[in-house]
Amino acid sequence: MQNKIDYKNIKKIGLVTRPNVSLDKEILKLQSILSIYKVELVLLKESSEILDLPKYGLDDLFKISDFVISLGGDGTLISLCRKACEYDKAVLGIHAGHLGFLTDFKVDEAENFFQAFFQGEFRIEKPYLLSIFLEDRQGKILEKLAFNDVVISKNNQASMAHIEVFRKEKKFNEYFGDGLIVATPAGSTAYNLSANGPIVYTLAQAFILTPVCSHSLTQRPIVLPKGFEIEIMAKDCMLCIDGQENYKMNDFKSIKVGLSDKNVALIHPKNRDYFQILKEKLHWGN
C-alpha cells in the first residue's frame, strides 16, 4: 500500500461523495481550493448530476487519480477504502455526514488542510483490513475485504444464533446469542464498542471477536493476533461485511476470517491525535 505521496507532483484528485445527497456547493469549494495548486478535481459519476466537471466510473476514477477524497461520513469512507486496496491509492476523508471517527475535518477547514498538505505537512496511517474467504457448496472461493467488521447474526426466523468457531479444524469456542462480531482495530469503535467490545489502537496488528448478547455470562470478547485465522460455522444466520454486503451463511460450506496483509493508506492532518479523538467522541474526562 502507498507509503508516501508525492505532494509536489499532484495532478488529479478524485472525489466520491455521500450517496443520495446533493453536495454541489461543497464540491465547488474544494475545486476552488485545489485550483490554487493547479490540481484538477475529478468526480465519481454519481457524485453530481449538475456540475460540469470531469466524471468517471469508480475504477477509472482510481486509475487516473493521485489519491481520492471521500466527502461524507464514515460509511462513505469505509466503502471507498476497500476499493482503494485494489489500486494502491490513498484516501482522504472529509466530513459531510454523521460525525464519525475516520473523517478529520469539514469542507470549511479544507483550505487550511491543503495549504499544509502541499507543504508536506500531513501524515499517512495504514490500518489493516480483514480478509474473508467464503467457499460455496461447489468449492468456489470468494475473497472479500472488511474495513470495520464482519457480523454474523441470526435471521428473522431463528430464536438465537448458534455459531461455532474453529482454529486449524479444532473448535475453540461456541456462541449462543444474537450474533458475533469480528472487528478490525479501526472497527473497534463501531458496532464492536456498542456490544461492549474493547477499543484497540487503530494500527495494531490484531482483530477482535465480540459476542452480541450472549446467553452465557462467561463469553467475553477476545483479541487475536495477525496470522491467526478462524473458521466460522453457523446455520440459518446472515453474514454482513461493513454493514454494506450481506450473505446467507447456508450458501457456504466454509467461511474463514483473519487479519489481512492488505492495509489502506489514510491521509490525515499532521496534528491528528487518536487519543484526543477518543476523548472528544466518547466524552472521556468530562
From Swiss-Prot:
The protein's required cofactors: a divalent metal cation
SUPFAM superfamilies: NAD kinase/diacylglycerol kinase-like
CC per GO annotation: cytoplasm
Pfam families in the cross-refs: NAD_kinase, NAD_kinase_C
Binding site for NAD(+): 74-75, 148-149, 178, 186, 189-194, 244
Enzyme class: transferase
Family: Belongs to the NAD kinase family.
Protein name as catalogued: NAD kinase
Originating species: Campylobacter jejuni subsp. jejuni serotype O:2 (strain ATCC 700819 / NCTC 11168)
